Amino acid sequence: MCSSDLPVSFTVQASEKVYATYLLEARDKGGHSSLPRPADNPIYHVAAALVRLSQYQFPVRLNEISRAFFERSAQLETGQLAADMRAVLRNPPDRAALARLSAAPFYDSKLRTTCVATMLDAGHAENALPQAARATVNCRILPDQPPAQVAAALGRIVADDRIAITTTYTPIPSPPSPLRPEILRPIEQLVAARWPGVPVVPVMEAGASDGLFLRNAGIPTYGVSAVFEDPDDIRAHGKDERISAQSFYDATVYWYGMMKAFAGRAN
């Protein structure tokens, strides 16, 4: 992570949230738009369900990786933000601190499972009542939370028998990789040599990676990008996705040193 092109922290992905996608669908016989039947309109049914989803927050669940993230991140911050990061590590976590951190999408993603509407599809003509309305809901599930719990929660949130919920991308659970000293130590040494003073921070990735397949094969996996990104300028999956050119070249130098270190050829 960087700020104003200056490295602030070096993250190591040791776990990732579980990717899952669901389809919410309501149907009706349709008709002409001059004779509306609001109580039967699939668009209204799905829209109301999405409003309920937008107002719901999944419970907070911290694991080894997310705890380490907030513990180390608190050392980088000052004032209220640093205090809030320490406060959520208490047992029980401070509710006011949770509310403030949850207001920031980046930190909220480290605290809980999230589900969000990403696509809508409804109707076939502007002068006809819709026969169907569909909404795609993408969820990022905490690695230690059973996906079945999330699917059941969606059913309770939707709370409408007229809406069918189907899984369109089946979740593949991905167990966290342990924070082993023999893994972190070489990374920390290389970071200290190249970016003095920049701390290494374990992170639970909110996105998805191929690491889940390796972890499910019993191979502990760690994501080491070495590409510093500004959290206020992340454009992943966008048409204008980009990284700093200098960050790219710095990363290739780091990767070369890292591969030599883990291959036993540090010099």
Q: PLM features: residue spans?
A:
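A common structural junction motif
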Residues: 53-57, 155-163
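A short core secondary-structure module
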Residues: 29, 33-59
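A generic structural motif
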Residues: 30-34, 124, 139-145
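Short, solvent-exposed loop/turn segments at the edges of secondary structure
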Residues: 7, 15-21, 110-112, 130-132
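Short, hydrophobic beta-strand segments
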Residues: 24-27, 135-140
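Short, small-residue-biased leader/transition segments that mark boundaries at the very start
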Residues: 1-3
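An extended, acidic, His-containing surface patch that forms the Zn2+-binding/catalytic region
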Residues: 62-127, 131-132, 143, 148-152, ...
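The feature captures the short pre-catalytic strand/loop hairpin that immediately precedes
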Residues: 20-34, 231
